[in-house]
């Protein structure tokens, strides 16, 4: 794809899935024609607690939340990436993952990525202690997918702090890497832009990062600043704090020139041990 139009939705999701879906659809309705891919943030369909995540977790390619997104993709004729939602583990039905799902414009599930790195940290904010591993099983596989806008590598939020994952996605042919996120206000203000631009520069990929913004319950506050960064590290679009869509035009034609002039992939002497799970129609039907 030489040029493509993408919309990154900045949301303030909460505990009510219907309200969250309505918020997503309202933003999609306001988009101009020509948008090929819509990306949503982490926790796009549900921003709640462990009990609620377990209650709403769905089977792969089956469930009411996925059906709503499937119908939305068909209705508006766009690809939609759900930044993350709770899913039942493919390895064990007793465990859940926080997973990013990619649907095509016909509503078919084309790719799934289970978040690899769990946000188990202590932050100097009201919430204080974050322990995703108490709720979720970490993923173990890379996911890359062919889309109308280019070859897409998938990550989620805290994954942004682990450059080896991004290098592995680049090695699997990623031209674009998505980073749906719910960065805290504290960590976002300090690190968000720096990390996004660094990952773009290091891997010579376009970075697309849809974000949560605002307050979610009594103790959670997210940074927002949805952002798109080109392969040279230039910010090509950002939305600081509005609950609205960021529309950007991306192009991947310059990637070849940048990569030929500075062949960092060939120069890299470190190899990831992660096993790639390439997305295709066979994976989607499992």
From Swiss-Prot:
Catalytic activity: N-(4-oxoglutaryl)-L-cysteinylglycine + H2O = L-cysteinylglycine + 2-oxoglutarate
InterPro entries the UniProt entry points to: C-N_Hydrolase, C-N_Hydrolase_sf, Nit1/2_C-N_Hydrolase, Nit1_Morganellaceae, UPF0012_CS
Active site: 42, 115, 157
One GO MF term: deaminated glutathione amidase activity
Signal peptide from the UniProt entry: none
Enzyme Commission code: 3.5.1.128
Annotated TM spans: none
Source organism superkingdom: Bacteria
Residue ranges annotated for the CN hydrolase domain, each copy included: 4-252
Entry keywords, A to Z: Hydrolase
Broad enzyme group: hydrolase
PROSITE patterns the UniProt entry points to: CN_HYDROLASE, UPF0012
Protein name: Deaminated glutathione amidase
Species classification: Bacteria, Pseudomonadati, Pseudomonadota, Gammaproteobacteria, Enterobacterales
């Amino acid at each position: 794809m030489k040029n493509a139009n993408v919309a990154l939705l900045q949301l303030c999701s909460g505990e009510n899935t219907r309200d969250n879906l309505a918020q997503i659809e309202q933003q999609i309705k306001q988009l101009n024609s020509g948008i090929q891919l819509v990306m949503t943030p982490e926790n796009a369909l549900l921003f709640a607690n462990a009990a609620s995540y377990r209650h709403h977790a769905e089977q792969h390619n089956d469930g009411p939340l996925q059906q709503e997104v499937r119908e939305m993709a068909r209705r508006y004729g766009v690809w939609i990436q759900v930044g993350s939602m709770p899913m039942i583990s493919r390895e064990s039905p007793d465990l859940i993952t926080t997973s990013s799902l990619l649907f095509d414009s016909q509503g078919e599930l084309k790719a799934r990525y289970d978040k690899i790195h769990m946000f188990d940290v202590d932050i100097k904010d009201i919430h204080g202690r974050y322990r995703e591993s108490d709720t979720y099983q970490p993923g173990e596989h890379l996911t890359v997918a062919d889309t109308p806008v280019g070859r897409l590598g998938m990550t989620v939020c805290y994954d942004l702090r682990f450059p080896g994952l991004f290098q592995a996605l680049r090695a699997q042919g990623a031209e674009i890497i998505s980073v749906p996120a719910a960065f805290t206000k504290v960590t976002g203000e300090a690190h968000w832009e720096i990390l996004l631009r660094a990952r773009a520069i290091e891997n010579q990929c376009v970075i697309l990062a849809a974000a949560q913004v605002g307050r979610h319950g009594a103790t959670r506050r997210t940074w927002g600043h949805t952002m798109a960064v080109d392969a040279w590290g230039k910010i090509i679009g950002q939305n600081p704090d509005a609950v609205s869509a960021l529309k950007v035009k991306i192009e991947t034609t310059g990637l070849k020139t940048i990569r030929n002039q500075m062949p960092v992939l060939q120069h890299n002497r470190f190899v990831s041990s992660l096993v790639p799970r390439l997305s295709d129609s066979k994976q989607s039907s499992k």
